[in-house]
Amino acid sequence: MTGQSSSQAATPIQWWKPALFFLVVIAGLWYVKWEPYYGKAFTAAETHSIGKSILAQADANPWQAALDYAMIYFLAVWKAAVLGVILGSLIQVLIPRDWLLRTLGQSRFRGTLLGTLFSLPGMMCTCCAAPVAAGMRRQQVSMGGALAFWMGNPVLNPATLVFMGFVLGWGFAAIRLVAGLVMVLLIATLVQKWVRETPQSQAPVEIDIPEAQGGFFSRWGRALWTLFWSTIPVYILAVLVLGAARVWLFPHADGAVDNSLMWVVAMAVAGCLFVIPTAAEIPIVQTMMLAGMGTAPALALLMTLPAVSLPSLIMLRKAFPAKALWLTGAMVAVSGVIVGGLALLF
C-alpha cells in the first residue's frame, strides 16, 4: 500500500489536490473571516467597541438560558463551524500525508512552531478549529503540531489582537500576544514530551485508502461524515449545558469580581470551561471591567477564555489521548493564573 500511495503521489495530475485545498482555504477564510474582520477593525477603532457581551442578560430559567445562548452563539459561529468541518475533512483527502509528516508530523519543536505559524491566518475560535485539528491528527500530525495549530487560532488571532488594542488598550493586546505565544508553544511542547502516542492514534485511519477503492467524492464523503459525527453532536450538547451555567460562571453584579487572587483563579478556570465565538472575550471583559472587575482577573480571563473550552476538548476526545487534553486544559488554566497573578504584583 505504501508503494502504491507513493507512486500515486508522484503522478503529475495529483497537483490539483493541494491546489483545490488551498483554494477552498483562501476562499472560505476570505468570506468567513478576513473580509468581515477588515471592516470590524475600523468599527473598533472608531467606537472602541465590537459589540455587546454575549453573556449579558442571562435568563433565570436554566433551560431558557441554554436555548438563548445556543441561538446567539451558533448564529455567530455557524459559518466558521461549517468551514472548519469542511477543511478538516478535505485535509484528509487532498493533502498528501507525507507533506504533513515532513512539516507538522515531527515530534521536535519545529513541528510545534510550524503548527503555530499555520494557525495565524485561520483566526478561528477553539471549537471551529477543533475539526481541522482532528483532521490533522487523522493524518498522523504530531500532538505538538496539532495542539499548536488548535490553540494558536484563537489565542494568536491577529484580528482579535487589533480589536483588543482599540477596545481594551494596546497594553492588554501586547500582554496577550507575548503571553499567548509563550503559552501556545510551551503547552504544545510539554504535551508532546509528556504524553506518548497511543497505538490507535499512530495507526492509519480507515479513510486513507488507495484511489482504486474509491474516488475523491466517496472518500471525502466518508471523511466528512466521520468528522461530523465525532465532533458536532457533542459540540451542540456541550454548548447548551454551558449556556445554562453561564450566569454562575460569570457574575456581572457591580463589584462582584474584585482584584484578588481568588478571582484570578476563578476566572482562569471558568475561562477554560466556557465557549465563545471569535474575539467575544473582548466585550465580555469590557463589560465586566465596567461592572468593577479588576485588571488581574481580566487578564486571566483574556488568556483562558479563547484558548480552550469544554466543548472543544470533548470534540477532540478521539483525536488526542485523554491525558493530552487534561494536561492542555490544566496548563491553560495555570497560564491564566500566572498572568493574572503577575498583574497583582505589578
Language-model-detected regions and their locations in the chain:
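Hydrophobic alpha-helical segments of integral membrane proteins
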Residues: 46, 50, 59-74, 100-104, ...
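Membrane-helix interface motif
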Residues: 33-43, 245-248
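Transmembrane helical segments that form the transport core of multi-pass membrane transport proteins
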Residues: 55-56, 67, 84, 90, ...
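Alpha-helical transmembrane segments of multipass membrane proteins
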Residues: 88, 92, 183-191, 242, ...
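Alpha-helical transmembrane segments in multi-pass membrane proteins
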Residues: 76, 80, 84, 88, ...
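Juxtamembrane and boundary regions of transmembrane helices in multi-pass small-molecule transporters
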Residues: 13-39, 106, 111, 168-211, ...
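Membrane-interfacial helix-loop connectors
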Residues: 119-177, 250-324
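Intrinsically disordered, low-complexity non-transmembrane regions of multi-pass membrane transporters
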Residues: 1-23, 39-61, 196-223
